[in-house]
């Protein structure tokens, strides 16, 4: 089973979604984790749109990447440009992969209403699902 870490800045939205999808789509192929370079808290809208898709991330918490420095990962996936630039060096021989997704909280801040805001989250959720579904090839 491959150990995979999804890394973004806040570990609040995109990396949380990716971890949730990996556990849902590939439970026998991936041991998935997520972390941030500057963690905050899990975004309630991310929890909501993942629940709509049948994935429960309500029990997740935001974690700093340093919590995983003693784990040997097979793959570290950065899901935002900032995390790619500041990816910790201690991941050693882990293969590194970058796939940038737009930031739903940033997109949602100009939304006219909650439904429009959630639309941004749903679109990114679905893009992350498509990406994670193909990750078993790596």
Put a short name on every predicted segment.
Residues 74:
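Conserved acidic residues
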Residues 84-138:
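Phosphate-binding/catalytic loops
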Residues 1-67:
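Conserved active-site segments centered on acidic
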Residues 12, 81-84:
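Short glycine-rich anion-binding loops that position phosphate/pyrophosphate groups of nucleotides
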Residues 40-42, 83-86:
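Short, charged/polar "capping" segments at the starts of alpha-helices
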Residues 36, 80, 100-102:
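Residues at the C-termini of beta-strands that transition into short coil/loop
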């Amino acid at each position: 089973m491959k150990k995979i870490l999804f890394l973004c800045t806040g570990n609040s939205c995109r990396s949380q979604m990716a971890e949730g999808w990996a556990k849902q789509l590939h439970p026998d192929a991936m041991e998935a984790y997520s972390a941030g370079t500057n963690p905050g808290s899990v975004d309630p809208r991310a929890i909501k749109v993942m629940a709509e898709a049948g994935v429960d991330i309500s029990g997740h918490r935001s974690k700093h990447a340093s919590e995983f420095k003693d784990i040997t990962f097979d793959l570290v996936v950065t899901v935002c440009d900032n995390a790619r630039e500041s990816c910790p060096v201690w991941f050693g021989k882990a293969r590194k992969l970058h796939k940038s997704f737009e930031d739903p909280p940033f997109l949602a801040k100009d939304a006219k209403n909650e439904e429009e805001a959630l639309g941004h989250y749903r679109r990114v959720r679905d893009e992350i699902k498509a990406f994670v579904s193909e990750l078993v090839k790596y």
